[in-house]
Amino acid sequence: MGGQIMPIASFGQTADGREVQKISLRSEQLTVTILTLGAVINDVRLTGVAWPLTLGSPDVAGYEGKLSSFGSFMGPVINRIKGCTAEIDGQRYTFEKHHSGNLTQHSGSTGMHRQIWSIAEHGPDYVVLTLSLSDGLGGFPGNRDITLRYDIEGASLRMTATASSDAPTPFNPA
């Protein structure tokens, strides 16, 4: 291929054997690599700049370790939930406890940043990723469908997210 960027290629496998793909997007000014693991923005390169504009890992293991939050689309609830519980529509729900104390952080081990997203659609300058989270996953109510679109135009990267649920549920991603 002689230096040509492949639009979709393997990035490797998670420790539990799930395949991770990387999607390369390109404009005249920008090249962006998105991963299906956590919808991670893995690499951003601006034409004429010799270094990457983002921090990332060259392999899946990095994103399963200390870089698990780097560049990923986190949720369904980002940050912390004090006490690992919340009342939603009159019912109390319990969430995964973080090792650092009595709180849930970034939706726990089943958060969106730990999931493999599906490639629904792609082109040279965009990709649409989808993810379905089942009712009760991570303690959160509702069957949730999330769509995430990355577009590049010129030197700009735009991310658009939409979500739906069949039940009241907290959704505060980042």
Say what each PLM segment does:
Residues G2-A174:
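Surface-exposed acidic/polar loop and edge beta-strand patches at domain peripheries
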